[in-house]
Design a protein with these regions (language model features):
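Beta-propeller fold detector
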Residues: 80-83, 136-141, 180-184
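Hydrophobic beta-strand segments that make up the repeating blades of beta-propeller
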Residues: 108-112, 155
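Repeat-based blade/solenoid architectures
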Residues: 37-39, 83-94, 140-151
Length: 184
């Protein structure tokens, strides 16, 4: 009687042929994810700013959702802002700190997704409120686009007007809010 047997050498050889490329592919995709900053759960801290009494950490929640965790260094009070953007979801890519209204307090611009299939990102502007000691999203800016400083107490927002044209709305800070000045 002839016994059936499986050649372990052949099975092991097949396993090696399958396993080695699988491991190589896994390492490659992990390296790409780390290089792009697209590792869910890995926090990054915004670079220190002189006399800035807050620490800002970016915590990716998925490949496009993130939390900006803002900690007051003095009171240890935490504020969390959730937003969306494209990778890399790192603090140095998503956060800008600037005193846009020249009130002596820092303001935060968070970068979002490109708007209307364009190269312009939809930024969110958070102004520091000294009474609440929190950053509050401004409601005075009507267009979603990239926000830039343009002189003392003024900003402009680049945005896509339609499928062919881009535009800029200019605002200046007066009496505690942003006032529309002109469109260019």
């Amino acid at each position: 009687m002839k016994k059936n047997h499986i050649s372990l050498g052949g099975a092991m050889q097949y396993k090696k042929l399958f396993t080695i490329p699988f491991i190589a592919l896994s390492l490659f995709s992990t390296a790409c994810a780390v290089q792009s900053g697209n590792v869910v759960g890995k926090e990054s801290v915004y670079p220190p700013v002189a006399n800035f009494s807050f620490e800002i950490k970016i915590k990716p929640l998925s490949d496009m959702d993130y939390q900006a965790i803002i900690t007051n260094k003095k009171t240890k009070k935490i504020q969390i802002i959730e937003s969306m953007s494209h990778p890399p979801l790192t603090a140095d890519n998503l956060v800008q700190i600037q005193d846009l209204n020249n009130d002596g307090y820092p303001d935060i611009i968070l970068k979002g997704f490109p708007v209307a299939a364009s190269a312009i990102n939809g930024n969110e502007l958070y102004m520091f409120n000294p009474e609440t000691k929190q950053f509050e999203e401004t409601k005075d800016i009507t267009q979603l686009g990239e926000i830039h400083a343009s002189g003392k107490n003024c900003i402009y927002v680049d945005y896509r007007k339609n499928s062919m044209e881009y535009s800029q709305d200019h605002y200046c800070w007066r009496n505690g809010k942003w006032h529309f000045i002109e469109n260019r």
